[in-house]
Amino acid sequence: MFENLRCAVLWSLGYRYSFWHRLAGLKDARLRAEQVMEDIGLARRRDTPAGILSYAEQRALEIGITIASGADVILLDEPTAGMSNTETEEAVAMIRRVTEGKTLVMVEHDMGVVFGLADRISVLVYGQIIATDVPAAIRSNAAVQKAYLGTSLNHD
């Protein structure tokens, strides 16, 4: 698992199949990969092959690879799909932690995940944006409630 992260860090530092590279950069890459492992909660699984990580751990590793690459904009598609409630809560906390100061664009149907992560939400129904606002306003938006619940909770 460590090698997956180290490769992402090396790539972000410009090490692309180059035979001639600075050895000092390799130490920096190792330290950065170890920091990302800690950030995504997988430090204890450092030497575990990625293929035998649990599903939730594999998703965390995918996010870690993105973070290790130095991306300022992170795009996640259903990051918690298929996870248990506990795994989802842990994933949301980890995503919040590692995307702080970055732009996060996410497609997600689990509204608990959306409200747990978003500063701003756009609601898409049949390909049309029906609302864009802060989470509290989206939660009370009659059009959003009708689209997702079949009726408005506002009873207007």
Question: What do these predicted ranges mean?
Answer:
Residues 1-156:
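Glycine-rich phosphate-binding loops of nucleotide-dependent enzymes
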